[in-house]
């Protein structure tokens, strides 16, 4: 049976659109069935994978629209940490894809509800993170884990991040990077007005609740998209989501090498390992 792949490109990047056209011609020449962006809403449940040509934003949008379908990201953005193949190596990546030389890494998602009194104002899910974010003034957020009060955090807000989201806003705010295989979520205060700046890593089974206890402007942000303004007493409840974020992982993918190169994390650029290291095909904690 012919393999079936969807192809989506970032429309704002001419180089991505041009590469998408080349990829579709290549797939057709290798006896694969192709679904372009217009056909995806109908055929997506039948696809072997979706090839997303762009950056991390495009990959997350595709995952939101077509949950549980494996995604191969080809990076034509800047950092592109979720895009595990680079533009220069697209043909080799497709060879591995069509010949089943890959595995699928499943990452957890976040189910989020915003409750105001007895009303549920937001019922959504996130791939990377759920953020309570201040406007221009300090706010206060109460944090509860599994019903137990942790603390009240004065500052700019709070981030709850998945492993794949931990290398995004969470890391920038000083939170931990969670590698794949860590079955937990990072809870990171944003610029807390305190000398104690401690992020938490909680189990995937935990229920994370944030109660907004300020009268100042703040928003609920899901995967970078503002979805609601917050009022005093609002409750943001976060649990593990039902959906899975599925990435196509190609042979030779190495999370730590990608982490060094894409985030310029080389303290000494000339540093080399003193012993042989093995290639790890599983990228831990992709963003």
Curated annotation (Swiss-Prot):
A GO molecular function annotation here is: NAD binding
What SUPFAM superfamilies does this protein map onto?
NAD kinase/diacylglycerol kinase-like
Enzyme class of the recorded protein, top EC level: transferase
User: Reaction(s) catalyzed by this protein?
Assistant: NAD(+) + ATP = ADP + NADP(+) + H(+)
EC number(s) per entry: 2.7.1.23
Main localization of the protein?
cytoplasm
The UniProt entry, under InterPro entries, shows:
ATP-NAD_kinase_N, ATP-NAD_kinase_PpnK-typ_C, NAD/diacylglycerol_kinase_sf, NADK
Segments forming a coiled coil: none
Cytoplasm as UniProt keyword: yes
Q: Which domain of life is it from?
A: Bacteria
Task: Kindly list the places in or outside the cell where this protein is found, as annotated in its UniProt entry.
Answer: Cytoplasm
Binding sites annotated in the UniProt record for NAD(+): 56-57, 61, 128-129, 156
Pfam families per UniProt: NAD_kinase, NAD_kinase_C
Q: Name one GO biological process term.
A: NAD metabolic process
Q: Active-site residues?
A: 56
One Gene Ontology cellular component annotation held by this UniProt entry = cytoplasm
The Swiss-Prot or TrEMBL record lists the needed cofactor(s) as: a divalent metal cation
Keywords assigned by UniProt, alphabetized: ATP-binding, Cytoplasm, Kinase, NAD, NADP, Nucleotide-binding, Transferase
Does Nuclease appear among the keywords?
no
Q: Which family does it belong to?
A: Belongs to the NAD kinase family.
Task: Give the protein's biological function.
Answer: Involved in the regulation of the intracellular balance of NAD and NADP, and is a key enzyme in the biosynthesis of NADP. Catalyzes specifically the phosphorylation on 2'-hydroxyl of the adenosine moiety of NAD to yield NADP.
Q: What is this protein called?
A: NAD kinase
């Amino acid at each position: 049976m012919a393999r079936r792949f969807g192809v989506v490109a970032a429309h704002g990047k001419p180089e991505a659109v041009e590469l998408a056209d080349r990829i579709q011609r290549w797939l057709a020449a290798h006896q694969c069935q192709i679904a372009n962006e217009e056909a995806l809403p109908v055929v997506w449940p039948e696809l072997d994978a979706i090839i997303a040509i762009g950056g991390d934003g495009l990959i997350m949008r595709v995952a939101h629209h077509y949950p549980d379908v494996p995604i191969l990201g080809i990076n034509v953005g800047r950092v592109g940490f979720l895009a595990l193949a680079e533009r220069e190596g697209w043909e080799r990546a497709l060879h591995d894809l069509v010949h089943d030389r890959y595995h699928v890494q499943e990452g957890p998602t976040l189910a989020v509800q915003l409750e105001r009194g007895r009303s549920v104002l937001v019922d959504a899910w996130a791939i990377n993170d759920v953020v309570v974010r201040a406007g221009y003034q300090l706010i206060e957020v109460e944090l509860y884990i599994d019903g137990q009060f942790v603390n009240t955090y004065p500052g700019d807000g709070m981030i709850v991040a998945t492993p794949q989201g931990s290398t995004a806003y969470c890391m920038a705010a000083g939170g931990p990077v969670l590698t794949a295989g860590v079955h937990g979520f990072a809870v990171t205060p944003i610029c807390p007005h305190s000398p104690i700046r401690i992020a938490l890593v909680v189990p995937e089974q935990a229920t994370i609740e944030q109660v907004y206890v300020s009268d100042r402007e703040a928003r609920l942000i899901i995967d970078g998209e503002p979805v609601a303004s917050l009022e005093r007493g609002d409750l943001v409840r976060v649990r593990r989501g039902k959906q899975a974020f599925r990435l196509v992982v190609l042979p030779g993918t190495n999370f730590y090498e990608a982490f060094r190169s894409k985030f310029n994390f080389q303290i000494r650029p000339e540093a080399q390992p003193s012993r042989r290291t093995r290639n790890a095909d599983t990228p831990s904690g992709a963003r």
